[in-house]
Curated annotation (Swiss-Prot):
The keyword Ubl conjugation does not apply. This is Paramyosin. Signal peptide: none annotated. Its main location: cytoplasm. Pfam families: Myosin_tail_1 (PF01576). It comes from Brugia malayi. The keyword Cytoplasm applies. InterPro entries: Myosin_tail (IPR002928), XRCC4-like_C (IPR014751). Gene3D superfamilies: 1.20.5.340, 1.20.5.370.
Length: 880
């Protein structure tokens, strides 16, 4: 009975709190405060004190039981001795007295032990009541905490729901990250293709560079040749300029001489007019003189004799006239010689000018040839320059594109390096985390196996406890039956010993009342404890079912979380493998891109050097082109000057032809005059012959002048043809210039198209940069998500650790509960043994009462016998 007394508080202490704690397992130990731990320590201290009290009570009861057993043995022996010593003597009566004294001592000892037991029971009741109050308070606190734990559990359930939502979101983000990784792989493939295209483009640029270098060398050679030709042309130009200056000076001298000759010719014409008038006068005079000569001849014939003196006088006059005529003829001859000298000088100047004109024509032809060559070279140079410009523009565009791509590649490389470093760090962190996860997973699996094993053990323990509860119920029923039997026996013993107790009622009335009160209290306690036990059993069953359900739910949740963690771990391992493979691929592609970038950088440096060399060569070509353009302009200016000079020469030639015509007319008139003079002046035959010779020479000179004029006409015609050819070539040059302008316009349109394409490429580049920024942001978001996943994993790890700690605490509590159940079982066993001992004590008391009654009866009989003997002795003495 008293075992149930000691069972219910421990059950209330260790069953309900632990069960409530197990009910709120995911949250109770997660939110258990220091006060709860303090209360648990206080409860453990109280339990320890109660256990010590129980042990002391056990020791006392054991000692009492031993003493009772000894006393029962002694009583049995005494009863046997009393039965054997019933017909003994006074010595036996003395021994009976001694035995009664011993029995009194034993009764005192029994009473003292009963008092000690009652004191211990009162102390235990007080302690039990205090413990019950403490347990009630603690139960209330634990109920409050249980409500808090339920709220916390609900909150944790919400958090679990949120965590599942976040896990789903993380799965979605992971799927998106995988898609992004696939896009990154596609972009890496595109980048590798672009890098290959860049390599091919760089190879093409290298080939174009080699070709351009060869063309540049050829152009340098051509430019060198052109420079040499330009130097020669400049030298020829300088010589031509000098010759033209000399020709200009000569022309100016010739013009001055021509003006002088014109003035002299005018004077000669005036003189010829005067000579004509003089010749007319002389012819008239000659005619008159001939007439007079005829008259004179007639008169001479008539008057020869008469006028010999007059003839002499007239001969002197004729001589004077002849002298005068000879003087005039000499003057005329001198003037003609001067004219012939002037004509010879003019012929020399004409021949010199003709030779100069021929030289100029030859030089002009050479200049035209050189101009044609230079024009062809200029066209080639313009073509090459245009091609070089186009190539330079293309190269500059390609160079800018390559620079942009190189910068973009460098930026991509830097980003890839950063991403690679981050990925390496993430890989290392993920490897460490994976190792930790594997270890934690292994530990969690072991803990889960332990938890499953412990759960199985708990199920077995629950089954065992249920069996023990059933056994306790049966034991309780048996104890109740034994109590009823004991009560029945006690009633029968009371009925049998009612007569014997009449004498002991006064002494034992208080004890009986106390025992009755104690029995009532014990009955009340037993009823209360049975009710509490029933309630505790019901609560325990409900709690066990609830705990079982909760454990099953928690085990299912733990299994789900473990499965989720396993799946997450497997997915993380897969993602780690994928990321490691992607990292390897990215590392290989990064190395390839680094090599290609190094090659592109080397090629870029070579291209820069080539571009600098080409730019220098282009500058030289531009300088040469400018020089050629200036030379062309100078040649055009020289051509215009030559055309002007040719026109001047043509005008001079026309003037000379006019002068020649005038001279021919004048010579014809002079020849007519000379013919008339020869007709008129037979006397001046020598002068006439001389004049004829001079006229013949003049005619020859005239023929020569005619031939020279014919040559000049031919030269003029050839010069006109050359001028026409030059005009045709000039028109061709204009057309070519127009064609060049059209080509330049086409090139400008091409440049505009290229600029638009460049703008489009820059826009695309900006778009790609924006996409790369978006991808960087997405990578950062994925990194943040990975960090959050890592944090969630750390939190899950912490929760797993807390669960393991809770499982350990539960295990410890289960061990403590097992120890308490064992202690309760021991207490129950001790209580049963105590009850049995009490029953045996009651039986011993009843037997003792019987023995006392028998002993009293025997004493009375002995006294009566002694009295009878004494009376008999007195009577015998009296009789004696």
């Amino acid at each position: 009975m008293s075992g149930s007394l000691y069972r219910s508080p421990s059950a209330a202490l260790y069953k309900s709190p632990s069960m409530s704690a197990f009910g709120g397992l995911p949250a109770a130990f997660g939110s258990m405060s220091v006060a709860d731990l303090g209360s648990l320590t206080r409860l453990e201290d109280k339990i320890r004190l109660l256990q010590e009290d129980l042990e002391s009570a056990r020791e006392l009861r054991n000692r009492i039981e031993r003493e009772r057993a000894d006393l029962s043995v002694q009583l049995i022996a005494l009863t046997d001795r009393l039965e054997d010593a019933e017909g003994t003597t006074d010595s036996q009566i003395e021994s009976n007295r001694k035995r009664e004294a011993e029995l009194q001592k034993l009764r005192k000892l029994l009473e003292e032990s009963q008092l000690e037991n009652e004191d211990a029971m009162n102390i235990l009741r007080k302690k039990h009541q205090d413990a019950c109050l403490d347990y009630a308070e603690q139960i209330e606190q634990l109920q409050k905490k249980n409500s808090k734990i339920d709220r916390e559990r609900q909150r944790l359930q919400h958090e679990v729901i949120e965590l599942t939502a976040t896990i789903d979101q993380l799965k979605k983000d992971k799927h998106l990250a995988e898609k992004a990784a696939e896009r990154f792989e596609a972009q890496t493939v595109e980048l590798s293709n672009k890098v290959e295209d860049l390599n091919r483009h760089v190879n093409d640029l290298a080939q174009q560079r080699q070709r351009l270098q060869a063309e540049n060398n050829d152009l340098l050679k051509e430019i060198h040749d052109q420079k040499v030709q330009l130097d020669n042309l400049q030298h020829v130009k300088y010589q031509l300029a000098q010759q033209l200056e000399e020709a200009r000076r000569r022309l100016e001298d010739a013009e001055r001489e021509r003006s002088q000759l014109q003035a002299q010719l005018h004077q000669v014409q005036l003189e010829l007019d005067s000579v004509r008038t003089a010749l007319d006068e002389e012819s008239a005079a000659r005619a008159e003189a001939e007439h007079k000569l005829a008259l004179a001849n007639t008169e001479i014939t008539q008057w020869k004799s008469k006028f010999d003196a007059e003839v002499a006088l007239h001969h002197e006059e004729v001589e004077d006239l002849r002298k005068k005529m000879l003087q005039k003829q000499a003057e005329y001859e001198e003037q003609i010689e001067i004219m012939l000298q002037k004509i010879s000088q003019l012929e020399k100047a004409k021949s010199r000018l003709q030779s100069e004109v021929e030289v100029l024509i030859v030089d002009l032809e050479k200049a035209q040839n050189t101009i044609a060559i230079l024009e062809r070279a200029k066209e080639q140079l313009e073509k090459t320059v245009n091609e070089l410009k186009v190539r330079i523009d293309e190269l500059t565009v390609e160079l800018e594109a390559a620079q942009r791509e190189a910068r973009a590649a460098l930026a991509e490389l830097q980003k890839l390096k950063n991403l690679y470093e981050k990925a390496v760090e993430q890989k290392e962190a993920l490897a460490r985390e994976n190792k930790k996860l594997q270890d934690d997973l292994h530990e969690a699996k072991e803990a889960l196996a332990d938890a499953n094993r412990k759960l199985h053990e708990l199920d077995l323990e629950n089954a065992r406890l249920a069996g023990e509860i059933r056994e306790l119920q049966t034991a309780l029923k048996e104890s109740e039956a034994a109590r009823r039997d004991a009560e029945n026996r006690a009633q029968r013993a009371l009925a049998e010993l009612q007569q014997l107790r009449i004498e002991m009622e006064r002494r034992l009335q208080e004890k009986e009342e106390e025992m009755e009160a104690l029995r009532k209290n014990m009955q009340f306690e037993i009823d209360r404890l049975t009710a509490a036990l029933a309630d505790a059993e019901a609560r325990m069953k409900a709690e066990i079912s609830r705990l079982k359900k909760k454990y099953q739910a928690e085990i299912a949740e733990l299994e789900m979380t473990v499965d989720n963690l396993n799946r997450a771990n497997i997915e993380a391992q897969k993602t780690i493998k994928k990321q490691s493979e992607q990292l390897k691929i990215l590392q290989a592609s990064l190395e390839d891109t680094q090599r290609q970038l190094q090659q592109t950088l080397d090629q870029y440096a070579l291209a820069q050097r080539k571009v600098s060399a080409l730019s220098a060569e282009l500058e030289e070509c531009k300088v040469a082109l400018d020089n050629a353009i200036r030379a062309r302009k100078q040649a055009e200016i020289d051509l215009e000057e030559a055309n002007g000079r040719i026109t001047d020469l043509v005008s001079v030639n026309n003037n000379l032809t006019a002068i020649k015509n005038k001279l021919e007319t004048e010579l014809s008139t002079a020849q007519a005059d000379l013919d008339e003079a020869t007709k008129e002046l037979h006397a001046a035959d020598e002068r006439a012959n001389r004049a004829l010779a001079d006229a013949a020479r003049a005619v020859e000179q005239l023929h020569e002048e005619q031939e020279h004029s014919m040559k000049i006409d031919a030269l003029r015609k050839s010069l006109e043809e050359q001028v026409k050819q030059l005009q045709v070539q000039f028109r061709k040059l204009k057309r070519r210039l127009l064609g060049g302008k059209r080509v330049i316009a086409k090139l400008e349109t091409r440049i505009r198209d290229l600029e638009t394409a460049l703008d489009e490429e820059t826009r695309r580049h900006k778009e790609t940069q924006g996409a790369l920024r978006k991808k960087d942001r997405r990578i950062k978001e994925v990194q943040m998500q990975v960090d959050e996943e890592h944090k969630m994993f750390v939190m899950a790890q912490d929760t797993a650790d807390r669960l393991l700690e809770k499982l350990n605490i539960q295990k410890r509590q289960l061990g403590e509960a097992e120890s308490l159940t064992m202690a309760n079982l021991r207490v129950r066993r001790y209580q049963r043994e105590l009850e049995d001992a009490e029953g045996r004590a009651d039986q011993a008391e009843s037997s003792l009462h019987l023995i006392r009654a028998k002993h009293r009866h025997q004493l009375l009989r002995a006294k009566m016998l002694q009295r009878q003997k004494f009376t008999f002795s007195k009577m015998s003495n009296r009789d004696n």
